[in-house]
UniProtKB/Swiss-Prot annotation:
Function: Involved in unsaturated fatty acids biosynthesis. Catalyzes the dehydration of short chain beta-hydroxyacyl-ACPs and long chain saturated and unsaturated beta-hydroxyacyl-ACPs.
Assigned GO CC terms: cytoplasm; membrane
Cleaved signal peptide residues: none
Keywords of this entry: Cytoplasm, Lipid A biosynthesis, Lipid biosynthesis, Lipid metabolism, Lyase
Active-site residues (renumbered): 48
Top EC class, one word: lyase
Lineage, opening ranks: Bacteria, Pseudomonadati, Campylobacterota, Epsilonproteobacteria, Campylobacterales
Keyword Lyase applies: yes
Official protein name in the record: 3-hydroxyacyl-[acyl-carrier-protein] dehydratase FabZ
Cellular location(s): Cytoplasm
Record organism: Campylobacter curvus (strain 525.92)
InterPro entries, alphabetized: FabA_FabZ, FabZ, HotDog_dom_sf
């Protein structure tokens, strides 16, 4: 299990844009399971939508991408782990995105990502987001690890 303190050592994101709270399962170069607790206190709900708060789909996809970044960094060889602070993950593409169910304050988003392809510093991931075991969003993500 990886808590938010450890996640912040891996990812450069910070509040309000750090979108994963904990990693519950990780098999390097294979898959990751992480979650985010969605709360009404998040600034995004001031405008999306007043009186009818819905967590934006782009934020769900970004949360998937952040979980994928943790997976990619934790899959680096031991000798490269010390160099994580000098690296960052960039999005290359988002494909096949589908939003199947709205996400509201009080929901716990569970991100499940599997590696479809990995070559060098490029990763292709199948990402899915669930609430209480029900699929709410999915996308295929491509990202690249680069020097800062």
């Amino acid at each position: 299990m990886i808590d938010v303190v450890e996640i912040q050592k891996i990812l450069p994101h910070r509040f309000p844009f750090l979108l994963i709270d904990r990693v519950t399962e990780l098999e390097p170069a294979k898959h990751i399971v992480a979650y985010k607790n969605v709360t009404i206190g998040e600034p995004i709900f001031q405008g999306h939508f007043p009186g009818h708060p819905i967590y934006p789909g782009v934020m769900i996809v970004e949360g998937m991408a952040q979980a994928g970044g943790v997976l990619a960094f934790k899959s680096m060889s031991d000798e490269h782990q010390a160099d994580i602070e000098n690296k960052v993950v960039y999005f290359m593409s988002i494909d096949k995105a589908k939003f199947r169910h709205p996400v509201r304050p009080g929901d716990r988003l569970e991100y499940r990502l599997e590696v479809l392809k990995h070559k060098g510093n490029i990763w292709v991931l199948d990402g899915k987001a669930y609430i209480d075991g029900n699929l709410c969003a999915e996308a295929e993500l491509k990202a690249m690890i680069v020097d800062k």
